[in-house]
Amino acid sequence: MVEQGDAAPLLRWAEGPAVSLPQAPQPQAGGWGRGGGGGARPAAEPPRRREPEEPAAPEVLLQPGRLELGDVEEDQVVAVFVVTFDPRSGNMVEWCLPQDIDLEGVEFKSMASGSHKIQSDFIYFRKGPFFGLACFANMPVESELERGARMKSVGILSPSYTLLYRYMHFLENQVRHQLEMPGHYSHLAAFYEDKKGVLHAGPGRGSSLPPVYWLPSIHRYMYPEMKITHPAGCMSQFIKFFGEQILILWKFALLRKRILIFSPPPVGVVCYRVYCCCCLANVSLPGIGGTIPESKPFFYVNVADIESLEVEVSYVACTTEKIFEEKRELYDVYVDNQNVKTHHDHLQPLLKINSADREKYRRLNEQRQMLLYSQEVEEDYNPCEEDLFVLFFLEQNNRIFQTLLEVSASQDKTLTAEHARGMGLDPQGDRSFLLDLLEAYGIDVMLVIDNPCCP
């Protein structure tokens, strides 16, 4: 039985250079709003001291096999917004900049269903070509109009999710400020002016942006850097929560299946599971992945996303809405707590843990223990556990595809049980997985591993 891992506290983010806000130049903040009027006064908290920014390592998002170190990701914010829950109207966008940005659906993405039961949360989500991060807070108030509770989210949109963590602390402070002083947006307006990105002009500006590539490349450029503090990293919690079942998720992620993770609020830690699931499928060999759809981290989704999910052939997402379980046409794999299941008959064999899976899990834990030992005894924190986790699966995936490419280039194109063992797979237990893998990636080899004989 896999150990329940949600007792651990929410992950703490390691802050990079402090977000520096210019002084609000005028008392009346710009932006569009429907509620909480009145001139903006300075925020309750004092302005944060501007600290010198240290040169950061380049963080890039690349297609597999395309490592271009000059492509440094820009630190851009394309929108900032405040969402509130109105007892009469429901979720609504209270204020935003820029005024003409399309935020349809963001009022539901940034305030997860069921959030009224918790005090605070953070949510990653996807909105068209952009990624969003919102911080939610729930404050009791003595107001019959608000039915005893005031709930708001403050969030931002960016072309990529890898830099959103930098603003977590700022958003947490601002949502508390909005709860205590509704309608005062001067710090948010100043923040947007300081960080705003330039959108492409034209009616279809969102769709004209280049596609977002999340698949990493090699070593330090190999995965989106989320800088989670040691030792409460998302990878270690992911392994602790799912145990050996991460090998089941690994196979489904490598096959680019539609993976939907259900969990009641808070949803922040579940967004980390989406990220970790995506990290299982990295491949850095050239020529791999050209015929298979891009695997997309959608992070949090709700019923408002059903129409967009209907046309997706591959994604990883999470939700707090149980209704999704009934909509089987939207997903291939459904994860409820630690229960991984699929309604597709041909995928059922992939749900079984085999001897090769157990061996991989043993090696992963062995490497983790060696890393922890070196960190504690030798005080060597490079690489970190996140590096180890991603490298482990990257090397496993590269070994599989390197073998498959070599066999496909051979004269007889025959893939044997010996090849399977050399790839770290179980010839019998992973036969179905191998067949699906060959079909998904369009690799021309002949599998000569027979089905196990019936007794």
UniProtKB/Swiss-Prot annotation:
Residues 30-40 have a biased composition (Gly residues). Residues 214-362 form the cDENN domain. Pfam families: DENND11 (PF09804). GO terms for cellular component: cytoplasm. InterPro entries: DENND11/AVL9_GEFs (IPR051731), LCHN/Anr2 (IPR018626), Tripartite_DENN (IPR037516). Residues 364-455 form the dDENN domain. Keywords: Acetylation, Guanine-nucleotide releasing factor, Methylation. Probable guanine nucleotide exchange factor (GEF). May promote the exchange of GDP to GTP, converting inactive GDP-bound small GTPases into their active GTP-bound form. May play a role in neuritogenesis, as well as in neuronal recovery and/or restructuring in the hippocampus following transient cerebral ischemia. This is DENN domain-containing protein 11. It comes from Homo sapiens. The keyword Kinase does not apply. GO terms for molecular function: guanyl-nucleotide exchange factor activity. The modification N-acetylvaline is found at residue 2.
